[in-house]
Amino acid sequence: MTTLSVGIGGLLGVLARFGIGRLTLHHEQLLWSTVWINVSGSFLLGLFVAGGWFGRDLREGIGVGFLSGFTTFSTFSVQAIQEVDAGEPWRAFAYVAVSLVGGLAAAAAGYALGRRLA
């Protein structure tokens, strides 16, 4: 059952990510939508890991499946390199800084909230 829940969760996460990507028509919108996706995914993963709610199958379906399919480190990495290549090193720096600091802060906030609610 865990394999099935991870597969279904992953499919739903990828579809959600794809849908948001289709809504962002311009390069700059895509860049910041990736930040939003990764930061919100970090918060939710922290929340679910610390909260310990649900059974193992659903937790892994959400965490390993949906949130892993929804968030994307590879897109983050390539977009940062593309900004540098386009002559926008400061935009690349801001993108990386906001992504990393925002992701860590969101994960910490989600984790703290999950522990408090558990």
What are the roles of these predicted feature ranges?
Residues 1-118:
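Membrane-interface helix-loop junctions in multi-pass transporters/channels
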